[in-house]
Amino acid sequence: MKYSDLKYLAVDLPEAVMKEKWSGNFTGARKAIRRLLMSEGISYPLRCRLELELNNLDYIESRYTLSEEEALFVMQKRIPSMTAQELEELRIEDKADWMYIDGKVKFIDCFDATLYKVYPELWSATENGDESDYSLIQSVVDNAVLRMGESGQSKMTAHIHIRHDFNLKNEAVEKGKRLHVHMPLPLEKGSVKNLKIIKISPDCTSLPQKEDIQPTVYFDIEAGDGQVFSAEYEFDNELDYIDLSKANLEEIARTDVPEEEKKYLQEEFPHIRFTPHLTELAKELTGGETNPLLIVRRFYDFITTKTDYRFVRDYCSIDNIPEYCALNRRGDCGVQALLFITLCRIAGIPAVWQSGLDAKPGDVGEHDWARFYVPSIGWVYADLSYGGSSYIRGAFDRWNFFFGNVDPYRVPINDGFQKELAPAKIHMRIDPYDNQCGEAEYDDRGLTGAEVEYRYTEIDIR
């Protein structure tokens, strides 16, 4: 199966598999898949879909591991008075992600991680209340607006110096075999200025090229004990603040989208799909509006006010990510970004994925956001998860800021979703869609997320 065959996730599963899967009988689902794969007359797209589903089942089963009793124990660490009935209400309301596994309710291992960020009734029930700290971001917003008012121009800058380490767990090391490792690495383009690659260890086989959409440093090496792959770099992230509320709507309306940007209007299976539901949703939200900027603002408002920010299972185990977000009205940063991108493209507005790291002093981790094209203005940003967190806290200046802007405390690496690495991997990627943590494989098999470790070390962020 080729990397491009991921598009066949758009193929529906046979009913025999679906019945077993959603009843929680994963053993039965695997048996049904293997029986179908051995039968004659299976088309290539369906064969790929069934093979992908075997992988999906493994991911789902590995994540939905907490029993009801274990989940209640987790909740009681923050809310000691939490009862089993209250947990059940969270499950019924679909605020606590769960699934049937072998006939039993199992919660996803991260079900509680975002509850206290999203639902005021839960964070107010904890001893410390809302522990989210947005003071740095608020200062960025305040200063950007102030400088714009004083001079008409406002630049936002952060200096970021980090090290990314990646290694195989001991039990995954097969000494003497050829090991292939990809690690994400930013390129000097866009907002990334003065990039310095300080150290790559061990010696790499190749560095990313400027045309790479998901750039990586690549190692082709003999596997051995104690190997740690490391990339240390620093750069300045420089962004210009823009206040889209003051944009010239008439000029936007009379300016056409350039031909070179129209490639960002296309579907990209299996996820960026113009399904009947999403097409009608875009039409409903548009409501007859014709100005591109006002249309996009309606999409932004819908996602940031009507969908909940929630950690989700691995993307490779979700068949259609934007549809998942719209139907369930929840998703993490990338899920929300993909719904936004898809709605924009349906409406004829170019939009594209961007991802990398959220890099604030004391906190470095993966993050995804979106960019969209405004005629007569150009490419601007939308961060749906930061926008939603601002809205729920009544910080409407921050909410408006993240429509058109992102803060500079991030490492932009990837300029597209579901793009091939260079050189191409042989086997299924740990993350087939994004490139933030690292990938590894031997010639004869791919390595899973459970077989590797990675970490980001802050050296200097200011």
Specify the residue positions occupied by each region the protein language model found.
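Terminal peptide-recognition signature
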Residues: 181, 299, 370
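Hydrophobic/aromatic-rich core segments of domains that either
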Residues: 3-6, 10-23, 59, 74, ...
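Repeat-mediated protein-protein interaction surfaces in helical alpha-solenoids
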Residues: 1-3, 31
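Active-site nucleophilic cysteine motif
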Residues: 292-299, 329-344
